[in-house]
Regions:
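N-terminal metal-binding scaffold of metallo-dependent hydrolase/deaminase domains
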Residues: 1-39, 374, 378
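C-terminal cap of metal-dependent C-N hydrolases
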Residues: 7, 341, 351-383
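Alpha-helical scaffold segments that flank or form the walls of functional sites
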Residues: 51-53, 60, 70-123, 146-159, ...
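Divalent metal-dependent hydrolysis catalytic cores, especially in the metallo-beta-lactamase
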Residues: 63, 79-108, 123-136, 160-171, ...
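Active-site gating loops and adjacent loop-to-helix segments of metal-dependent hydrolytic enzymes
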Residues: 83-94, 137-160, 203-220, 227-241, ...
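Active-site core of metal-dependent hydrolases
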Residues: 159-280, 380
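His/Asp/Glu-enriched, well-ordered alpha-helical/loop segment
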Residues: 229-242, 260-272, 278-356, 360-363
Length: 383
């Protein structure tokens, strides 16, 4: 077994001091007071002075980083992402496809399924997030209109063992049969790239127990006092769990705070929506066959349309706390536990508890920068 001593430990509800985190490859074995810690049973003891121990982050919406993209026709792309993500505190993720030609989406989902069976090291792939191609042309964002198609569950059915989330525009559906098929298959419906009215969403989503909202505020009908739109529905429907890109580019700090006040600690999931340019230098990049220009923390198409982000999860957690006043346990839960709960994996992932996977991140207590990442009890990144 191994142990982390002298760190603060973030649990679901509080931050512990004077405790030791004991773990091995099979999971977290103990969270015990320093006075009761038996050091002789541990082969490695890490001094966590100046660090905060948090559960590994789970990123449910990420297109790429480190120069690669989920849509790349490259069998090594996912392995590269899995290897680099621990640098950002991510220990599990959903590779996210985008609105592309159907053969390319099929190939990407096939690669994801194969990788899930073969993966050995790095961040865990928990399944796929399909962002499109069943979206609205009005709010397509950085996705190509020519690749948008009508929703057809037969396109997803061969991959129901892989797809965990599908982003779509509900107003483009002729009826609720597609949504019912997703519910039956255990696939989370996420409203995004949608021009739906508040009333149309209420009609279409009536049969769902819960749903997600893809990057709240972005690429969807906005909140107006007479036309609440997707944003109004998301903020007022208790079933809705909302993704937020907290890079202060996609969302004004006040918009982040509004979401936090409306949705509470359980209704927000922090994401990055990052593209291949994340963890690379400023300059020209690519997304979905389109040129992207990156400067500092902003990624845009030539016409100024935001094109994903270059945000990391650790930075998103820091900004979310600063902008909303959320506590450290609340911000950490938004980047870990809330995702695990939605995916039905909170018995294994999402919080530091005895019996759960030893997916642990040590953050600098002053800057929240990632200093060490542990996956299944093995250190995979150390700054």
């Amino acid at each position: 077994m191994e142990a982390i001593i002298n760190s603060r430990i973030v649990t679901k509800e509080t931050v512990l001091t004077g405790h030791v985190l004991v773990y091995d490859e099979s999971g977290i074995q103990q969270i015990v007071s320093t006075d009761n810690f038996q050091a002789g049973k541990c082969r490695v003891i890490t001094d966590g002075s100046g660090y905060i121990a948090v559960p590994g982050f789970i990123n449910e919406h990420i297109h790429g980083l480190g120069g690669v993209d989920v849509m790349d026709d490259d069998p090594q792309a996912l392995a590269i992402m899995a290897k680099r993500l621990p640098e950002t505190g991510v220990t599990a993720f959903l590779p996210t496809t985008m609105t592309y030609d159907l053969p390319s989406i099929t190939r990407a989902l096939t690669r994801i399924r194969r990788y899930m069976k073969e993966q050995r090291i790095g961040a865990k792939v928990l399944g796929a997030h399909m962002e499109g191609p069943f979206i609205s042309d009005i709010y397509k964002g950085a996705q190509k209109s020519t690749h948008i198609v009508k929703a057809d569950f037969s396109l997803i059915e061969p991959f129901i063992d892989t797809v965990r989330i599908v982003t779509l525009a509900p107003e483009t559906l002729p009826d609720n049969s597609f949504l019912e098929a997703c519910k039956k298959a255990g696939i989370i419906v996420s409203v995004g790239h949608s021009a739906a009215t508040y009333e149309k969403l209420a009609e279409r989503l009536a049969g769902l127990d819960h749903y997600h909202v893809t990057h709240l505020y972005n690429a969807q009908s906005p909140l107006h006092h007479r036309k609440p739109g997707v944003v109004g529905a998301a903020l007022t429907d208790e079933r809705a769990v909302c993704e937020l890109i907290c890079d202060d580019v996609h969302l004004h700090p006040a918009a982040q705070r509004l979401a936090y006040i409306a949705k509470g600690r359980n209704g927000i999931i922090l994401i990055t929506d990052s593209i291949r340019a994340c963890l690379t230098e400023n300059g020209e990049s690519e997304l979905g066959g389109q040129k992207v220009f990156v400067h500092e923390n902003r990624a845009e198409l030539a016409d100024g349309t935001l094109a994903g982000s270059v945000l990391t999860m650790a930075d998103g957690v820091r900004r979310f706390m600063h902008n909303t006043g959320a506590s450290l346990p609340e911000a950490v839960a938004a980047a870990s536990l809330n995702v695990a709960v939605s995916l039905g994996l909170d018995h294994q992932l999402g919080s530091l508890e005895v019996g759960k996977a030893a997916d642990i991140v040590l953050l600098d207590e002053d800057t929240l920068q990632v200093k060490k990442t542990i996956i299944d009890g093995t250190t995979v990144f150390s700054a």
